[in-house]
């Protein structure tokens, strides 16, 4: 396996997880102090197979798998939920997550009915609140268990 880290200028793409790539994607992990923030990719992929609303992809920087994303989509109602989003610990801080989230937002906005993209975060040291706020996500004041719900309006006021 190639341990070369792609440059910050790498092209980020979202690709289907295949039988050939699933093991590599399942072996991507966040840092130890982030493990309480996101489920392992193997769990996410298994859950996706039991949810009609799930859409999931591996995140690549050039030809290197660097992360994973899963949305719960209800296109008819214009609702999107960022169910899982992770960048492997050794690839964090290089802009890949930012480029991937831009692609995810763009995907949701392609739907003329798209109203909002939701997500939830555990508010603790090392969580991604500020990362999401940088994209315009705002806290809704609602909770899902211990997770705080954030929302990005996709329709311009």
Predicted regions: what is each one?
Residues 2-5, 148-157:
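Terminal substrate-recognition subdomain of acyl/acetyltransferases
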Residues 7-83, 88-90, 101, 106-107, ...:
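Acetyl-CoA-dependent GNAT
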Residues 88-90, 94, 123-124:
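Active-site acidic-Proline motif in GNAT/NAT acetyltransferases
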Residues 95, 112-113, 136:
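Short glycine-rich hinge loops at helix-strand junctions in the catalytic core
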Residues 98, 123-141:
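Conserved active-site alpha-helix within GNAT-family acetyltransferase domains
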Residues 108-120:
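Conserved GNAT acetyl-CoA-binding A-motif
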Residues 118-129, 145-147, 155:
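Conserved beta-strand-loop-alpha-helix junction that forms the acyl-donor binding cleft
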């Amino acid at each position: 396996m190639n341990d070369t880290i792609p440059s910050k200028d790498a092209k980020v793409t979202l690709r289907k997880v295949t039988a050939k790539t699933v093991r590599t994607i399942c072996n991507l992990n966040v840092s130890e102090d982030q493990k309480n923030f996101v489920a392992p990719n193997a769990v996410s992929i298994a859950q996706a197979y039991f949810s009609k609303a799930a859409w999931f992809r591996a995140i690549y920087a050039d030809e290197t798998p660097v992360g994973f994303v899963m949305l719960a989509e209800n296109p008819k109602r214009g609702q999107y939920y960022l169910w899982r989003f992770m960048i492997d610990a050794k690839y964090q801080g290089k802009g890949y997550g930012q480029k991937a989230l831009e692609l995810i937002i763009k995907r949701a906005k392609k739907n003329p009915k798209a109203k909002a993209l939701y997500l939830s975060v555990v508010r603790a040291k090392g969580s991604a609140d500020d990362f999401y706020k940088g994209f315009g996500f705002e806290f809704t004041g609602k909770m899902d268990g211990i997770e705080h719900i954030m929302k990005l309006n996709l329709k311009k006021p």
